[in-house]
Amino acid sequence: MSLDINWSLLSQPDESATDQLSESLIALLNAQLAEAHRPSFIGPITVTAFDFGNAGPDLEVKDIRDVWRVFDQGDDEGDFAEEEKQREKEREERDKLRNEALKSSLDGERYELVDRYSSTEGTSSFEYQPEYDIHEQHGDDYRIRGRRPLSYTFGYPHDRLAVHRSSSSRSFIPFPFDHPPPALHIPSTPGLNPSLVSHPISARFSRRPMSIAASAAPRPTPRRRPIEPSSTSPSPPAHPAGLPPKASSSSIPSLQLHLRLSHASDLHLTLLTSLQVNYPSALFMALPLKLSITGFQLNADIVMAYSGEKNRVHLTIVDDESNPAHKEDKQIPLGQRLLSNLQIESEIGHADAHVLRNVGKVERFIVDVVRKTLVDELVFPNFHTVAL
């Protein structure tokens, strides 16, 4: 089955659409050439002009079949790269939502839930030692008298715990004539359990003399209960709302076409690059090089496969033994059989100085490089994949 292609639609009747298509192809080619590997003596390659020409290709459909498994198996690396990009995007979105959930008007404030037995100032640990505090401040007086005043027993109506500060040796055990210290005020913090501060301190002890209470009740140990971040910050959703849903498979069924292409083209393609001399140092000398491709002759058997599940197109060239060109010229290299003719015009040097035109050795070298690249990149088992 043969296909008739109206090649003239690429240039007529709307020339503006043709210009837009040419510009998009130039941008695509420049992006691919920027990432492509090139020899050390070839500088950056840039496409400056592109024209489809007037001669169209002859295309024959040889077969339609199922997609080769090798295309999907060989594209696993691309799948892993896409999945990794998607996971990275999801992680960034979750981090963004988590940071937004933790923002509040109290940013910069630091609150700590302190146990009722610990000090309210400083970070030093606290251990209740009433005898140590009494003798530290009034040791000589009470050792002479041989007894403790009633105000230092737990039976005192206004009994309070002694608070030992690391920055001062003063004891804060209240005397009978002292004014009672202000009650401990804990700022209102989201997630704070009111039951931790609602009970009075004296409720933890019986109203008994010091000699009995000190020997019977164990000494409380300091405990700090930090506020858990999980109690105040909501957990992020399993799938962020900002991420687009995963694309469903295409409704177009998967298929594979075997095509025979014969194209004597008169397209025009202009490239700019440079010849670099890296001796005795890197970029020791560079000569501007302008290449203009004015036509080529391509004869190839092409396999084009479409994967509806992944929405991708795979393209490769096969060396079919049934091809007439293969039977006639078995001794000709594959690259030369595929690309039998490539017309190139070259210019070396600066336009405002001395210019060498149509240098045969340079042109033949470029043709050999193009043929080798065509075989290494597109001839099966190598293939090119386009993600739609």
Swiss-Prot record:
<keyword id="KW-0256">Endoplasmic reticulum</keyword>
<comment type="similarity">
    <text>Belongs to the MDM12 family.</text>
</comment>
<dbReference type="GO" id="GO:0008289">
    <property type="term" value="F:lipid binding"/>
</dbReference>
<dbReference type="GO" id="GO:0005789">
    <property type="term" value="C:endoplasmic reticulum membrane"/>
</dbReference>
<feature type="region of interest" description="Disordered">
    <location>
        <begin position="209"/>
        <end position="251"/>
    </location>
</feature>
<dbReference type="GO" id="GO:0032865">
    <property type="term" value="C:ERMES complex"/>
</dbReference>
<dbReference type="GO" id="GO:1990456">
    <property type="term" value="P:mitochondrion-endoplasmic reticulum membrane tethering"/>
</dbReference>
<keyword id="KW-0445">Lipid transport</keyword>
<dbReference type="GO" id="GO:0015914">
    <property type="term" value="P:phospholipid transport"/>
</dbReference>
<dbReference type="InterPro" id="IPR027532">
    <property type="entry name" value="Mdm12"/>
</dbReference>
<dbReference type="GO" id="GO:0000002">
    <property type="term" value="P:mitochondrial genome maintenance"/>
</dbReference>
<comment type="function">
    <text>Component of the ERMES/MDM complex, which serves as a molecular tether to connect the endoplasmic reticulum (ER) and mitochondria. Components of this complex are involved in the control of mitochondrial shape and protein biogenesis, and function in nonvesicular lipid trafficking between the ER and mitochondria. MDM12 is required for the interaction of the ER-resident membrane protein MMM1 and the outer mitochondrial membrane-resident beta-barrel protein MDM10.</text>
</comment>
<dbReference type="GO" id="GO:0045040">
    <property type="term" value="P:protein insertion into mitochondrial outer membrane"/>
</dbReference>
<keyword id="KW-1000">Mitochondrion outer membrane</keyword>
<dbReference type="InterPro" id="IPR031468">
    <property type="entry name" value="SMP_LBD"/>
</dbReference>
<feature type="domain" description="SMP-LTD">
    <location>
        <begin position="1"/>
        <end position="388"/>
    </location>
</feature>
<keyword id="KW-0446">Lipid-binding</keyword>
<dbReference type="InterPro" id="IPR019411">
    <property type="entry name" value="MMM1_dom"/>
</dbReference>
<feature type="compositionally biased region" description="Pro residues">
    <location>
        <begin position="234"/>
        <end position="243"/>
    </location>
</feature>
<feature type="compositionally biased region" description="Basic and acidic residues">
    <location>
        <begin position="83"/>
        <end position="101"/>
    </location>
</feature>
<feature type="region of interest" description="Disordered">
    <location>
        <begin position="75"/>
        <end position="101"/>
    </location>
</feature>
<keyword id="KW-0472">Membrane</keyword>
<keyword id="KW-0496">Mitochondrion</keyword>
<keyword id="KW-0813">Transport</keyword>
<dbReference type="Pfam" id="PF10296">
    <property type="entry name" value="MMM1"/>
</dbReference>
<protein>
    <recommendedName>
        <fullName>Mitochondrial distribution and morphology protein 12</fullName>
    </recommendedName>
</protein>
<comment type="subunit">
    <text>Component of the ER-mitochondria encounter structure (ERMES) or MDM complex, composed of MMM1, MDM10, MDM12 and MDM34. A MMM1 homodimer associates with one molecule of MDM12 on each side in a pairwise head-to-tail manner, and the SMP-LTD domains of MMM1 and MDM12 generate a continuous hydrophobic tunnel for phospholipid trafficking.</text>
</comment>
